Amino acid sequence: AFAGVLADADIKAALAGCAAAESFNYKTFFKACGLAGKFFAIIDQDHSGFIEEDELKLFLQTFSAGARALSDAETKDVDGDGMIGVDEFVALVKA
């Protein structure tokens, strides 16, 4: 999904920064990739206007099939409704 959008080196650096369990940090990841503005639409695989926790758990695998799935703790949304809207996502990556 990211072919031609991100440089392979940027993807590798971003994935390396969160290889260990419980180490994923949205701000660091998006900063390493350099394209926070385009990610919401890409992660929202079903184009519902929200990122569901299941979509977010498989987020790293969008970059590389061998990447780990994110844990429940790493994908918990702020308001607890199980979905991350655009405003919540922007706040999350800018936090």
From Swiss-Prot:
Binding site for Ca(2+) 2: D77, D79, D81, M83, E88
Pfam families: EF-hand_7
A GO CC term assigned to this protein in UniProt: cytoplasm
GO MF term set: calcium ion binding
Known role: In muscle, parvalbumin is thought to be involved in relaxation after contraction. It binds two calcium ions.
Family: Belongs to the parvalbumin family.
Remaining remarks: Is regarded as an important allergen. On the 2D-gel the determined pI of this protein is: 3.79, its MW is: 11.32 kDa.
Name this protein carries in UniProt: Parvalbumin beta 3
Phylogenetic lineage: Eukaryota, Metazoa, Chordata, Craniata, Vertebrata
